[in-house]
Swiss-Prot record:
Gene Ontology MF: a single term: 3'-5'-RNA exonuclease activity
Source organism of this protein record: Pseudomonas entomophila (strain L48)
Name used for this protein in its record: Polyribonucleotide nucleotidyltransferase
Alphabetic keyword roster: Cytoplasm, Magnesium, Metal-binding, Nucleotidyltransferase, RNA-binding, Transferase
The enzyme's E.C. designation: 2.7.7.8
Amino acid sequence: MNPVIKTFQFGQSTVTLETGRIARQATGAVLVTVDNDVTVLVTVVGAKQADPGKGFFPLSVHYQEKTYAAGKIPGGFFKREGRPSEKETLTSRLIDRPIRPLFPEGFMNEVQVVCTVVSTSKKTDPDIAAMIGTSAALAISGIPFEGPIGAARVAFHESTGYLLNPTYEQLAASSLDMVVAGTSDAVLMVESEAQELTEDQMLGAVLFAHDEFQAVIKAVKELAAEAAKPTWDWKPADKNSALFDAIRAEFGEAVSQGYTITVKADRYARLGELRDQAVAKFSGEEGQPSAGEVKDIFGEIEYRTVRENIVNGKPRIDGRDTKTVRPLNIEVGVLPKTHGSALFTRGETQALVVATLGTARDAQLLDTLEGEKKDPFMLHYNFPPFSVGECGRMGGAGRREIGHGRLARRSVQAMLPAADVFPYTIRVVSEITESNGSSSMASVCGASLALMDAGVPMKAPVAGIAMGLVKEGEKFAVLTDILGDEDHLGDMDFKVAGTAKGVTALQMDIKINGITEEIMEIALGQALEARLNILGQMNQIIGESRTELSANAPTMIAMKIDTDKIRDVIGKGGATIRAICEETKASIDIEDDGSIKIFGETKEAADAAKQRILGITAEAEIGKIYVGKVERIVDFGAFVNILPGKDGLVHISMLSDARVEKVTDVLKEGQEVEVLVLDVDNRGRIKLSIKDVAAAKASGV
C-alpha cells in the first residue's frame, strides 16, 4: 500500500495524518504530527473472531510516552521505560471513554489501541494528537465503529475568550483546561478543571470545542475515503424476542417491584433470586436457551424497567424525585491523631477522607517528558472491595482509582492556597468505605472538609455532585445524585464540582447521540442547585478553615537570609546544615534567593533550628549588648565570641575604668561576659567594650 497523507489546519496548528508507511501489519495505523512539535504513532488491532468465553467487549487502550521522544534516557537502574505513569494511565482513559460507546452493541471481538509518543518538543500535551490518531486508525481499520470522533483542548481567558489547543505556557495563564471529544453531531466526553467559571462559560467551552473539532472529523473521513480497508462483515446475533417476551411476561412485574426496594443489598438479593428463578425456568434442558442467554435477557428487562419507570415520572429506585439529593451525614475531626479528617456520607455512599501535611521534601517527584517536576499536592482515592460488600483483589491502585483520584484532585486544587502563603506539601487520601454511586464526588466533599479541618487556608469550600440522564425517544429525565444502578442503566454520567461562586471541575461521559444543548443546560442547572444545597450543609459543620494547624502537624517557619550567607548556613560539604538538622530534628529547605523553610515535628524543634540559623547569619549591631564567651586572651586584650563564628576584640583599655595591668587579672578563657559593640570596620572586625556596658544599660540600650 502506498502511503496516504492528509494535512489540515486545526486552530493555530497544522496537523498531518499519514498511513501506509509504518506499522503496516496492524489492522489500522496512523502517524499524527502536529506542527512538527508532537508526533504520535497510533495502531489498532482487532481480533477477527470473538472469544466465546468473554461476556463483555474486550477493548484496551494503551498510551505510552517514550523518553527518546524528548531526547532523554530513562532514569533508574534499568534505563528503560517501566510501568505506565499516572499521566499515561489518565490519557489512556481519556482516549477510551469517547470511543467505547461507538462500537456496536453485541460486538465482542478484542480490540487493542496503542498510542506511542515518538517525538515531542515539550511545548504541547500529546494527548489530543493521540486521540485524533485513534479516531483515524479506527476509521481506516475496517473494524465496526460508528465514528470518526474529533477531540480538542480548550483554554479560557477572561479578556480573550476561548483558545483552541493551547500550549503549556498558554494553559498556565488560563482559568480553564478542558478536553472535549465527540462525533460530528454529538459530544461524548468532557474532562476539565477550572477556576470557578460559571455554568454558561463551561457549556460555551464544550460547544466551542465541538464546533472546532469538526475539522478533525472531516480530515479523518477524507483519509478513510482513500486508505480505509473493507468494513468487516459483522452482524450482531439475532435477538430472541420470543424469549424476551416470555421472561418479561413471567417476571416483569416482580422486577419492577424489586426496583422499589431502597436498600441496595436487599434489592440485589431480591433481583438475584428472580434471576435464578428465570434461569431455572427457561434454561437447563436440551433445546432450551443457555443460562448465559437467559441472564442477558433478564438484564435487558432490568434495563428497560428502570428506564421506563424514570421517564414516565415514577419515583426513582430509592423513592426520590429527579432533583433530590440523598440524606447527608457530615463529620470532621473523626481521627484523633491525623492532621485533618472528615467522614462524608451521602445515602449509601461514604468516604473517610484524611489530609496530611508534610515538608517540601515530601512533594511527589515526577519524571515527565517535559523534565522533572515536584508536585506539592496529592489526592489518592482507594476503592476497597468491602465498600460494595464483596471480596476482591487488594493491591496497587487500578486505572479507575487513578482516574477518580485525579477528578477529585482537579475539583479542589484551584481552591488551595498559593505555595508562598502555605508552603506545606499536602496529601489527601479518600478511603471509600461504602459505595452506591458517585464516590468520586463524595471524595471531593470529604477532601474539602478534611483540608479545612487540617487548617489549610482554603479559598472556598468545594462540593461535587453526579448527574445522570435517561432518554427514551423524545422523553428524558435528568437525575440529581445518581445511584450506582442509575449510572449503569442510564445514558450519561455528568459530574460537576465547584464552590458557591463557580465550577472547578466538570467530567462528562455520554453513551448515546442526541444530547442537546438544552439537556446539558438543565443538567448544569440542577447540578448547581444540588451543589449549593450540599455546600450549605457542609458549612453548618465547618464553614471555613481552622485558624490553627493540628497539634499533630509539623510546624513550619519561613524566613529569609542574605544570599551571600547561604554558604555559611550550608557549610563545607553541607556539614553545618546537616548538623543543625540532626541536632534539632528539624528539616530545612534553602532556595537560591535566600528563602528558608524550616519544618519541625514540634514547635520547639523548628524554633531551635531558626535560632541556629539566625546565629550563623546575624551581624553584630553597633551599640548592642551581647553576652559573649572569652575565647582567647592576648597581651593587648581579649577576643570574645558574641555570635556563631564572630569574635570581637576587647582592648585592654576597654576592660575596666580602673587601670588593668594584665588581662588575666580581669578575665579568664571560657568566662561569659557582657560586651558592648563599639564599631565594625569595613573588614568586618568588631571592636568591643566591657567597661561601657553599665553606662549603655543606664541609657536604655
